[in-house]
Curated annotation (Swiss-Prot):
Self-association and partners: Binds to the N-terminal domain of the chaperone ClpA.
Protein known as: ATP-dependent Clp protease adapter protein ClpS
InterPro entries xref list: ClpS (IPR022935), ClpS_core (IPR003769), Ribosomal_bL12_C/ClpS-like (IPR014719)
SUPFAM superfamilies: ClpS-like (SSF54736)
Protein's job: Involved in the modulation of the specificity of the ClpAP-mediated ATP-dependent protein degradation.
UniProt region (Disordered), positions on chain: 1-24
HAMAP family: ClpS
């Protein structure tokens, strides 16, 4: 005997739990955007101090921001990325976060 459950109705608890699991399964990323204000050396310094990146890695990310207009500088939970974005804003950098799919 095979027992199958009915599909979840839109907005039902089963569907909401599934959407919630999908949202937490995909990591979030912090993106730093190029701006006309901050010097490249300062951006490298901020990456080293805030994230503990080595100078070569921080320089690589800074060059990606400079040349491509943006770079992903960290990934993790939504809450952790909110903290990273706040720290970058406090340092004067343009940063956003988005879910990485």
């Amino acid at each position: 005997m095979v027992v199958a459950s009915a599909p979840a109705k839109p907005g039902s608890v089963g569907q909401q739990e599934s959407a919630s699991r999908d949202a937490t399964a995909s990591p979030w990323v912090t993106i730093v955007w190029d701006d006309p204000v901050n010097l490249m050396t300062y951006v490298t310094y901020v990456f080293q101090k805030l994230f503990g990146y080595s100078e070569p890695h921080a320089t690589k990310l800074m060059l990606q921001v400079h040349n491509e207009g943006r770079a992903v500088v960290s990934a993790g939970s939504r809450e952790a990325m909110e903290v990273d974005v706040s720290k970058l804003h406090a340092a004067g950098l343009w940063a956003t976060m988005q879910q990485d799919r």
